[in-house]
Every structure is written in structure tokens, then in C-alpha cells.
Amino acid sequence: MRPRAAGFTLIEVLLATMLLVGGLALAFATLRSASAISQRGEAIAQRSERTRAVEEFLRRRLSAALPIAMGIDTQSQQPMLFVGEPQRMRFAADVPDYLGRGGPYLHDVSVVGDGEQRTLTIALTMLQSGKEIEEGNALPAETLADDVQQVSFRYRGLDPQSGALSGWLPQWEWHDRLPLLVRIDIRSGGAAWPPVVVALPQSGGGGALAQ
């Protein structure tokens, strides 16, 4: 019998090649999976960071709300200190210099659009003696959150007639006073944000008008 020649047979080479190709395919699949997981993780982290930033901004602006007149209610003829609707609220608060010229500004927080692609925006307008002052370099409304499916604002405060604490109201009817609490619920990307509940320190329990 002739001895077997040294080296690999064609079958062995083919098997080794198939194993190598299979190993490379598995390695590339693992890399793609890891890359996809990493990208999803980064996207989630960015959304979470954006959510926290928007929540903190809203908390700071609402907690800075002041009992300063933004105009006169045409029905009651009383100064308007706070206007709260299901998807819009308007109030006065001082702003830091990087947001404007300092001093009180009208904050107009509203939901734009409908359906599944709504946008939460804020517009700032200078206030002087209860009147809106248009600035020459006024900034347009800023986007706080886009691609939002649902946004709702609710308000809680003292009923001026009974003096009792109200439940959560979709409409703040007493424009001549600040609510005690404001709640904001946002849903985007198929998930609900943590509810934002803010106490308004300057409400004073009844929102007395600042002189």
C-alpha cells in the first residue's frame, strides 16, 4: 500500500473553507447586531436626555411664573395672570439674559399640529405694564419637542367661590390668579413621558396680583 501523501485533501480544504466562511459570517452578523444594539442604545439615550432637558426647562419656567398682568380679560375686565387651556398656556415670568433682555416675558407654551406629528413650542414676548412689546430682534417660537403624539395640560388650584382645592382641570377658568399646580403629560415615540407636575410658588394660594 502506498503511503498517503502529506498535506490536505481537497475535501479537507473545502471543509476548512466552509468553516472559515461560516465563522466570518457569524462574526460579521455579531458585529452588525452589536452595532445595531449600540445605535439603538445611543438613540434611546439621546431621547432620554432630550426628555429630561425639556422637562427641566418646563419646570424652571413654570416655577418662575409671576402674578403679573398680561392684559385685561374682556369678559371679566380683570387682569389676566394665567391662561390655561388643554393644549396651550400663557403666563408671565422673568427670563435670564440668554433668553432675552431680562425682566418679565410672556411665555406662550402651545401644541402645534394634529394627528401623530405634533410639536410642543414656546414663544417669548417682552411685557411692560401689562402690554406685549414687540422687539426688533424678536426670536421665533422655539421647538421643545417634535413628533409628539399627545400633549395635555391640566391645572389645579383653589376655587375662588368655595375656597376648596379643585381637581385636575383641563381649563383654568380663573385668569386673575395663578393655579397652584400644573401637570403636563406628553406621549411620543409610542411611549409616555413621566408626568411633569410643577408647583407655582408665586400663586400664594390665591394668586394675589402683584403691584
Curated annotation (Swiss-Prot):
<dbReference type="InterPro" id="IPR012902">
    <property type="entry name" value="N_methyl_site"/>
</dbReference>
<keyword id="KW-0472">Membrane</keyword>
<keyword id="KW-0488">Methylation</keyword>
<keyword id="KW-0812">Transmembrane</keyword>
<feature type="propeptide" description="Leader sequence">
    <location>
        <begin position="1"/>
        <end position="7"/>
    </location>
</feature>
<comment type="function">
    <text>Involved in a type II secretion system (T2SS, formerly general secretion pathway, GSP) for the export of proteins.</text>
</comment>
<dbReference type="GO" id="GO:0015031">
    <property type="term" value="P:protein transport"/>
</dbReference>
<feature type="modified residue" description="N-methylphenylalanine">
    <location>
        <position position="8"/>
    </location>
</feature>
<protein>
    <recommendedName>
        <fullName>Type II secretion system protein J</fullName>
    </recommendedName>
</protein>
<comment type="similarity">
    <text>Belongs to the GSP J family.</text>
</comment>
<dbReference type="GO" id="GO:0016020">
    <property type="term" value="C:membrane"/>
</dbReference>
<keyword id="KW-1133">Transmembrane helix</keyword>
<feature type="transmembrane region" description="Helical">
    <location>
        <begin position="8"/>
        <end position="28"/>
    </location>
</feature>
<keyword id="KW-0813">Transport</keyword>
<keyword id="KW-0653">Protein transport</keyword>
